[in-house]
Amino acid sequence: MFITFEGIDGCGKTTQAVLLAKYLSDLYGEHRVVLTREPGGTSLNELIRGALLGLTDYKLDGITELMLFIAMRRESFVKVVLPGLLAGKIVISDRFTDSTVAYQGYGCGVDLALVGMLNSLVADVVPDITFVIDASIELALARTSLNGFENHGPEFYDRVREGFRTIVANNPHRCHMIDCKSDAAEDVYSTHDRIVALFRAITQDKLKVAK
């Protein structure tokens, strides 16, 4: 099974991905769960991620950014995601193809057909379940120290947020929007509980993973 978490920077998706990975690891065993992230997931990608995060005043144009992230996705897909799925594991990814559509497509204005074509070329797998964590722009920006490739203004994040909402509306069979209201610990775990309940409802106890 392939599960992805999506949303704007600072929405809380990384925390929720980690919490779900722990929950499923406790349920099925750590050896049956793979947690990865984009950009990142491999030693090479993590080096590139670190370099990108260090770019405080350097701007990439939309096409350059798209091609860079697409190449990193291919590296992660063939080294982490696909092997995990072929081994029958539950793979959880903090970001996947929907992020490219929302960020480079809706956010940067790159042609959506081009984004879709490149996504399909490098990763011909569609997630089984996608949780889109929706948070206000104000809350998200307050949570994160914006730098490097994340250094964009509120208007950009408005476009990206609307992009994610459009993706959810267009893919109701796999995408599920989860509202995140605050940073409070009780809200974080309440969100986790909602995700677990939704996961159980979606799978309907049909997920059979050998321990």
Swiss-Prot record:
Keywords: ATP-binding, Kinase, Nucleotide biosynthesis, Nucleotide-binding, Transferase
One Pfam match: Thymidylate_kin
CDD domains found in the cross-reference section: TMPK (cd01672)
Matches recorded under PANTHER family: THYMIDYLATE KINASE, UMP-CMP KINASE 2, MITOCHONDRIAL
Protein name per Swiss-Prot or TrEMBL: Thymidylate kinase
Function: Phosphorylation of dTMP to form dTDP in both de novo and salvage pathways of dTTP synthesis.
Binding of ATP, residues: G7, I8, D9, G10, C11, G12, K13, T14
Family (UniProt): Belongs to the thymidylate kinase family.
Record-linked InterPro entries: P-loop_NTPase (IPR027417), Thymidylate_kin-like_dom (IPR039430), Thymidylate_kin_CS (IPR018095), Thymidylate_kinase (IPR018094)
One MF term in the entry's GO annotations: dTMP kinase activity
Annotated Gene3D superfamilies: P-loop containing nucleotide triphosphate hydrolases
This enzyme's EC code(s): 2.7.4.9
Enzyme class: transferase
Keyword Kinase: yes
GO biological process: dTDP biosynthetic process; dTTP biosynthetic process; dUDP biosynthetic process
Catalysed reaction, written as an equation: dTMP + ATP = dTDP + ADP
Gene name for this UniProt entry: tmk
Listed GO CC annotations: cytosol
